[in-house]
Every structure is written in C-alpha cells, then in structure tokens.
C-alpha cells in the first residue's frame, strides 16, 4: 500500500516565506496510549466490534499497522507493545487450529486437559480488557472530581464536637446521684491514709539577704538563675523574697548587677567591700510585709 505524502508544503515557498526543511513536509499525529491494552480498546471501539467476540484477524492487522506508523515517525516502541503483538499473533494461530470435541475425550485428567484446550483462546484477553476498562473508567471519573488545593480549598476552622442524640445517652434512665453515692461507698471501704500538711518556715528579708551574701563571698560573683535551683525547690514566696532581697541590696549599693549582652546571663557582683560591713540587723522587714 503506497501513500501520497505530498502536501501543500512541497510547493515552492511564496514571496516573503522561509524555505521549509524536508522534515516539515510530512507530519502524523497519533493518539497517546497508556499501553497495549489501551490501544486494543481504541481499535475495538473504532471498528465497532463486540469485545466478547473479537475478530483477531482484523484487530491484529490494525494493531500491527499502528505499530508500523509509530516506526515511520521514529517513535520508540515500548516492549509491552511488541509483546502484545506477539500475543495477538499467537491467539490468531490458535483460532485457526481445529477444536477437539470434549465428548470424545477420555475421563479423568484427559478431560480437563481437553477442556482447557477447547476453551476460547480469546477468553484471557477479553478478561484483561474488561478489567483494564473498569480501572480506566474509574480513573476518568476520579479525574472529573475537584482536587483539594487546586479546585477547592478547605477552611482552617476547629472541628466542632458532634452532638450525641438523646436516644444514645447511656444514663437516660439512671440518676447520676445514685452513681455518686455508689462511689462514696467504694471510697469508704478503702483504708484511710494519714494526711499531713508540710508548712515551710517563713523566710524574712534579712535571711534572704544573708543567703545571697553567703553565695557571693566564696567566689566573688554568682549567677542570678543559680539562686533558684530545682534541687532546693524554692516556694513562690521564697522566690519573691529573694528577688526583693536583691533589689534591697542594689538599693543600698551592696552589690552590682551586670549583664554583658542582651538576654545574656545576669551576674551579681559585690560592690567593693560593702558586704564585709553588712550587719544582719540593718534590714527592717516591716517595709515588705
């Protein structure tokens, strides 16, 4: 079969047009198939044949023609297309062989062998085509749905609690007070535990100042954070009293507070020999109660 590949582009270029290269004279547009099964479905629909009664001679011929067109335009043919071509040729040859009669076969294993031999060779191909068509239809249906983040966008709102219908409430016919009374009876049967409350001694401002002085004298400096270590587990009241003691010592110019950089560690340094002259009775706690 010969084709006339001449087109209007073979004519001489008109005035003002650039000459065309030989590769631009002949162009073929082929549909893009996902695989050999997709191509077979296309051929079956194009020639309007029954998928359950595939004319292998016609379909094989059209399939090979399509592969030949792909070669003509220098397309790389995937191996799966060539495997399907050989499969179609094999099925076509099997269809030409005479079928054996199951009734004339012997009983036992020979019957099963003959039954398999007399089965329609196209059955497996039809099954694969139907299964592929099912997944293809599902993919096309999913492709029509809106895509989150592209077509639709979710609102970032807190999920509200779903109200429970009244008929699903478990305590509908039971008093909650009775449940509380039952809990009280269980607690009464438990062995009572001895409870005692530990009360910390109240720290005065003078005592807090002396504690800071004791931390400063050995090393000549102390970190502010080290006055509140987790090992000593200071109470909220002790933390406040210690902070007031530091303010009082700065006010009386007993210590200096130094920070070399923003958000850096805070150092407490003695102001000369002022700490050596400090007497415990010089601070009155009445101003900070």
From Swiss-Prot:
Segments of this protein annotated with the region Disordered: 1-24
Recorded hits in Pfam families, A to Z, give: SMC_ScpA
Q: Where is the composition biased (Basic and acidic residues)?
A: 1-18
Q: Where is the major localization of this protein?
A: cytoplasm
* Top-level division of the source organism's lineage: Bacteria
The entry's cellular-component GO terms read:
cytoplasm
Q: Which UniProt keywords apply?
A: Cell cycle, Cell division, Chromosome partition, Cytoplasm
UniProt note: phenotype after gene disruption: Conditionally essential, the primary defect in a double scpA-scpB in-frame deletion mutant is in chromosome segregation and organization. Cells are temperature-sensitive; they grow slower than wild-type at 25 and very poorly at 32 degrees Celsius. Increased sensitivity to DNA gyrase inhibitor novobiocin, cells are longer, and contain 2 fully replicated chromosomes that are not completely segregated. ParA, PadC and bactofilin BacP are less organized than in wild-type. All these phenotypes are stronger at 32 degrees Celsius.
Q: Name one GO biological process term.
A: cell division
Q: Where in the cell is it found?
A: Cytoplasm
Q: What induces it?
A: The 3' end of scpA overlaps with the 5' end of scpB, indicating the genes are cotranscribed.
Q: Which InterPro entries match?
A: ScpA (IPR003768), ScpA-like_C (IPR023093)
Subunit details: Component of the Structural Maintenance of Chromosome (SMC) condensin-like complex composed of ScpA, ScpB and the Smc homodimer. ScpA and ScpB bind to the head domain of Smc. The presence of the three proteins is required for the association of the complex with DNA.
Family from the record: Belongs to the ScpA family.
Q: What does this protein do?
A: A conditionally essential component of the chromosome segregation machinery. Participates in chromosomal partition during cell division. Important for positioning of ParB-parS complexes (ori of replication) and of the ter replication site, as well as for segration of the ParB-parS complex and thus chromosome segregation. May act via the formation of a condensin-like complex containing Smc, ScpA and ScpB that pulls DNA away from mid-cell into both cell halves.
What is this protein's name? Segregation and condensation protein A
């Amino acid at each position: 079969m010969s084709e006339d590949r001449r087109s209007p582009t073979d004519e001489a270029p008109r005035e003002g047009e650039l000459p065309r290269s030989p590769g631009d004279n002949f162009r073929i547009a082929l549909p893009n198939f996902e695989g050999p099964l997709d191509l077979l479905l296309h051929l079956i629909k194009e020639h309007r044949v029954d998928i359950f009664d595939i004319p292998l001679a016609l379909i094989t011929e059209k399939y090979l023609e399509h592969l030949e067109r792909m070669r003509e335009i220098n397309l790389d043919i995937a191996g799966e297309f060539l495997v399907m071509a050989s499969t179609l040729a094999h099925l076509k040859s099997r269809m030409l062989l005479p079928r054996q009669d199951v009734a004339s076969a012997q009983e036992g294993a020979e019957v099963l062998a003959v039954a398999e031999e007399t089965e329609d060779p196209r059955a497996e191909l039809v099954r694969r085509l139907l299964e592929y068509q099912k997944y293809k239809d599902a993919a096309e249906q999913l492709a029509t749905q809106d895509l989150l983040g592209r077509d639709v966008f979710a609102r970032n709102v807190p999920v509200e609690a779903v109200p429970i219908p009244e008929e699903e409430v478990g305590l509908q016919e039971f008093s909650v007070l009775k449940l509380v009374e039952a809990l009280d009876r269980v607690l009464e049967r438990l062995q009572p535990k001895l409870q005692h409350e530990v009360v910390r001694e109240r720290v005065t401002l003078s005592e807090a100042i002396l504690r800071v002085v004791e931390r400063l004298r050995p090393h000549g400096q102390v970190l502010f954070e080290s006055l509140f270590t987790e090992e000593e587990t200071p109470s909220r009241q002790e933390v406040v009293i210690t902070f007031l003691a530091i303010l009082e010592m700065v006010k009386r110019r007993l210590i200096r507070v130094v920070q070399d950089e923003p958000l850096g560690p805070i150092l407490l340094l003695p102001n000369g020999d002022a700490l050596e002259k400090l007497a415990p009775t010089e601070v009155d706690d009445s101003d900070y109660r």
